[in-house]
């Protein structure tokens, strides 16, 4: 009797029918796939994307060259050199470079900064095409910060309660 059941199951392709029934069940369910280039993936306001340097509202750069971000970076991606400023002699950065190949976007530099000078922007779509573009200089970082300043300020306001 057992052998007969086995023959009938193999003749009717029982396993194939079970698989097809499972496929049909999932075929009519709501799709959860996002077609990436055409549809944007929703991201949190805490998303850690491209790095940027911020300025004060009067246009002065925020970085005071304390080198805490350089010290806390686990990938050693940040290089800072400091010097006195001509106007009042306070310490400012003369060189602020970040190697994008080394950076792991951990956010430690952002947390360590006492004046919120370095931030991670919500920009996730960036590429490096030429040799040497991986070094983000102070000027590039300030330009990125100027471009995203409004959005950074909005995201900081949302997150203020938790900081």
Curated annotation (Swiss-Prot):
Its EC number is 7.1.1.-. InterPro entries: 4Fe4S_Fe-S-bd, 4Fe4S_Fe_S_CS, NADH_quinone_OxRdtase_chainI. Coiled coil: none annotated. Pfam families: Fer4_7. It is an enzyme of class 7 (translocase). Its main location: membrane. Its cofactor is [4Fe-4S] cluster. It is found in: Cell inner membrane. GO terms for cellular component: plasma membrane; respiratory chain complex I. It comes from the Bacteria. It is a peripheral membrane protein. Keywords: 4Fe-4S, Cell inner membrane, Cell membrane, Iron, Iron-sulfur, Membrane, Metal-binding, NAD, Quinone, Repeat, Translocase, Ubiquinone. It catalyses: a quinone + NADH + 5 H(+)(in) = a quinol + NAD(+) + 4 H(+)(out). GO terms for molecular function: 4 iron, 4 sulfur cluster binding; iron ion binding; NADH:ubiquinone reductase (non-electrogenic) activity; quinone binding. [4Fe-4S] cluster 1 binds at residues 63, 66, 69, 113. [4Fe-4S] cluster 2 binds at residues 73, 103, 106, 109. The keyword Cell inner membrane applies. Belongs to the complex I 23 kDa subunit family. NDH-1 is composed of 14 different subunits. Subunits NuoA, H, J, K, L, M, N constitute the membrane sector of the complex. NDH-1 shuttles electrons from NADH, via FMN and iron-sulfur (Fe-S) centers, to quinones in the respiratory chain. The immediate electron acceptor for the enzyme in this species is believed to be ubiquinone. Couples the redox reaction to proton translocation (for every two electrons transferred, four hydrogen ions are translocated across the cytoplasmic membrane), and thus conserves the redox energy in a proton gradient. This is NADH-quinone oxidoreductase subunit I. The gene is nuoI.
């Amino acid at each position: 009797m057992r052998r007969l059941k086995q023959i009938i199951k193999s003749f009717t392709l029982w396993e194939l029918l079970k698989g097809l029934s499972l496929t049909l069940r999932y075929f009519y369910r709501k799709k959860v796939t996002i077609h990436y280039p055409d549809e944007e993936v929703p991201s949190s306001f805490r998303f850690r994307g491209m790095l940027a340097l911020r300025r004060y509202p009067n246009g002065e750069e925020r970085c005071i060259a304390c080198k805490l971000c350089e010290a806390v970076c686990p990938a050693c991606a940040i290089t800072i050199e400091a010097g006195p400023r001509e106007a009042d002699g306070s310490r400012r950065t003369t060189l602020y470079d970040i190697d994008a190949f080394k950076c792991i976007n951990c956010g430690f530099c952002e947390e360590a900064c006492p004046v919120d000078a370095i931030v991670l922007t919500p920009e996730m779509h960036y590429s490096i095409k030429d040799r040497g573009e991986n070094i983000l200089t102070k000027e590039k970082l300030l330009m990125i910060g100027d471009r995203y300043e409004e959005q950074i300020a909005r995201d900081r306001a949302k997150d203020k309660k938790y900081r």
